[in-house]
Amino acid sequence: MRTPFIAGNWKMNKNPKETQEFLDGVKGKLPDASKVETVIGAPAIDLTTLVAGAEGTPLKTAAENCYFEDEGAFTGETSPKALKEMNVDYVIIGHSERRGYFHETDEDINKKAKAIFKNNLLPIICCGESLAQREAGQTEDWVASQIEAALAGLSADQVKVSVLAYEPIWAIGTGKTATADQAQEVVAHIRATVEKLYNKDTADAVRILYGGSVKPANVKELMAKPDIDGGLVGGASMDPESFIALANYQD
């Protein structure tokens, strides 16, 4: 049984003071981690505050990116080794904003995935198509190729504990949402891709999220789909009340 997974991605928002206010706002109101795993992905400058505040609570923490080297002359990059030493749990990689604005390639994302595992962290690996690709009927091939490239060289055991996230680029921050049926269709295809690359056990174990304008109003419908295990949530994860509602969608 895959534990549901509700993850916030704050992107380039909130300072440490606002992070502490958020933590105070959700304290004691998140479900037990055995029921729903809750995670907040925050900018690097907020992670010290986030990790300290999440300690002893069900909330887990994620960095929004890291580099594939542990240390060195890489000005402005975030070390996965340092993230582990800070007690961060997850790292989000392959987000369409990283691919689009910062020209990250499938090869970069694969190197990052390996560096994350080398440092005993866990990846949240994103994939998704543009509107042009969807309209051209290329969604399934494109998403499968992104997943295959990201997972190259990872063991089945590593993939089982990874989290994958389907984020159609046309539905991120646009207010457009893939219907629950559209999301389920692509997420099922991602699971089938994992089965083809590995085996059924691995495909049944890996958690796959949907991201793209997920909010309290649509989370229940998305979570009712058999292959959707959670949400990677942008804007709706920044408000404590909204995040609490998402996390407690089962109630």
Swiss-Prot record:
Binding site for substrate: N9, W10, K11, G173, S213, G234, G235
UniProt-listed InterPro entries: Aldolase_TIM, TIM_sf, TrioseP_Isoase_bac/euk, Triosephosphate_isomerase, Triosephosphate_isomerase_AS
Gene Ontology CC, one term: cytosol
E.C. no: 5.3.1.1
Superkingdom of this protein's organism: Bacteria
Gene Ontology annotations of biological process type: gluconeogenesis; glyceraldehyde-3-phosphate biosynthetic process; glycerol catabolic process; glycolytic process
Signal peptide interval: none
Keywords from the UniProt entry: Cytoplasm, Gluconeogenesis, Glycolysis, Isomerase
Subcellular location: Cytoplasm
Pathway connected to this protein: Carbohydrate biosynthesis; gluconeogenesis; Carbohydrate degradation; glycolysis; D-glyceraldehyde 3-phosphate from glycerone phosphate: step 1/1
Annotated GO MF terms: triose-phosphate isomerase activity
Catalytic activity: D-glyceraldehyde 3-phosphate = dihydroxyacetone phosphate
Enzyme class: isomerase
Active-site feature positions: H95, E167
Xref: NCBIfam families: tim
HAMAP family recorded: TIM_B
Complexes and interactors: Homodimer.
Family of this protein: Belongs to the triosephosphate isomerase family.
Primary role: Involved in the gluconeogenesis. Catalyzes stereospecifically the conversion of dihydroxyacetone phosphate (DHAP) to D-glyceraldehyde-3-phosphate (G3P).
Protein name from the UniProt record: Triosephosphate isomerase
Species this chain originates from: Lacticaseibacillus paracasei (strain ATCC 334 / BCRC 17002 / CCUG 31169 / CIP 107868 / KCTC 3260 / NRRL B-441)
